[in-house]
Structures are given as C-alpha cells and as structure tokens.
Amino acid sequence: IVSIAQGVEGLFIENNRFNTTSISYNFYLPLREETVAENALLPFILTASSKKYPDFSALNLKLNKLYGARLDASAEKYGDCQLLSMRISVINDRFTFDSDSLVKAASDMLLGLIFEPNTENSAFMGNDVEREKRKAIEHIKGEIAEKRVYAKNRLISEMYKGEAYGIQKCGTVGQVEAITGESLYRAWVNMLSSAFVRVQVIGESLPPKFFEAVAEKFENLSRKDITDCRLCKPTAPAKKVKTVFEKMDVKQGKLVMGFSSEMYGDDDVSL
C-alpha cells in the first residue's frame, strides 16, 4: 500500500493470469440520510461524461479506441460508510499494436472523468442530472418490484433502524427527485475533499507514473475531515426477537431472517 496524499492510498496487485488490467477509485464517505442520494448518484454521472467527453457518443468513441475498454460504477454500503466506486477495465498492452501504453491512456481517461466532470457555473449539466435521476429512480422502484431484494432491504432497515447501516444505499425516490445540479456539484466537491480514497490497480504492470499523476490531482485540493472508514458503531444487543409482518398482494411470500454480531479484527474469529 502506497500513501499518495492525505487520506489517499494506492494499491497495486500484480496479476498475470488475466488479459485485462482493472483500475478502480473507491471513495468512502459517512452514510447519512441527508447526503446518501447525491453521493449514490455521483459515480454514475461522473462515468457518463466529462469536460473532454461531454456526451455518450464522444465517451463511447474513446472507449472503442481503447479496444473496447469498459467503465463501471457502483454505490454500496460499507459498514457505516457509503462506498462510491468507479472502474475501468482495459486489455493489457502486450495484446495491442499501439506504441503508446493502452493502460496508461485508460488510467488518464478515468482520472479525467473523476476530476474534470461536465459542469458549468458550479453545477452539473441539467440534462445529465435528469437522466441519471431517472435511472436511479427506476433502479429503486425495480428493487421494490423484485420481492427478494425488497425483503432483504426491509430486513436491514428494521434491524438497523436509527443507525447508519439502516439507510437505503441509494436513498429514496423522494430524495433522488430533490437532487439538483448544484446539490450534486457540492456533493462532488465534498467527495474529493473529505472522502477516504483507495486507488487500486490489478494487472500485469503499473502504468508509468500512475500514482504520481493521482497525487498531482489531490495536491490541488484542500483535504480535511477525512472519513475514517474503520469506525463502525456497534449494534446494541437485541433483548428479544423482533418479528415484522408486511402484507402485500403477491403469489409467493418471502421469509428473511437476520442475525447481527460484533466485528472483529482477528481473521480466525471472523471466519
């Protein structure tokens, strides 16, 4: 693990078994009701366009030139933190006919997407925001329609009611609808300035001066109040079994049971 900047770690895992190199940026932020929706939208809008690639056509053309490189984004819960991830996967340089490093070009592209988004007057572009909001709302409603997923999410919200982990990872439909280009821009600034960041590369080799390029981006930022993703508030022991019934017009019922235990640093105990 390499220290890149304050609250920013770099990790290179050498692996020759695969034909591709994977580069990921992982941002850890506190899981809070008032910021969960904006944060969850960030990885998706950041990997959809940028200043250099302002629309899907320009972005897709660049990915095709990188031999079909693939962009991915996700927003998950990690204990009491929200984990925002952006990744790019590209074939290793030894499989290409180009003289320039394909992996280096892909890493530069992802870095630009994160640090140079398509914004104007301290706000994300309205069309981009509305598109991602629509997709997020469809995702939330889709989880409700998928009863197994809905049952699991309801279990977690009941088990951890009043705690950070009980918050829905993408927020509610109402919270997503309230997002504006300005509020999303503020969330982006907060992510870059206060998130704990882990940059991970898995592949045959590290792109030339990769960590130096990342460090240069963070050097220009005022990093403060860095999220400590190791802190996790312990759940109070349950005095009795809590049973929740929820009636719905479905053909098949779902039974979900949840058990909570303490977190341990010892590998043997965790296993």
Where do the PLM segments sit?
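Active-site SXXK
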Residues: 39-47
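A common structural junction motif
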Residues: 108-120, 216-225
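His/Glu-based metal-binding/catalytic segments typifying zinc-dependent metallopeptidases
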Residues: 12-38, 189, 196, 215, ...
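Short, polar/flexible loop-turn hinges at active-site or ligand-entry regions and domain interfaces
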Residues: 49-52, 94-97, 116-125
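Acidic/histidine-enriched alpha-helical segments
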Residues: 60-61, 116-140, 227-236
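Short, Gly/Pro- and small/polar-rich lid/capping loops
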Residues: 1-7
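Non-catalytic, conformational "gating/processing" segments within enzyme and secreted inhibitor domains
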Residues: 181-217
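M16 family metallopeptidases and their MPP-like homologs
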Residues: 11, 19-39, 57-112, 148-171, ...
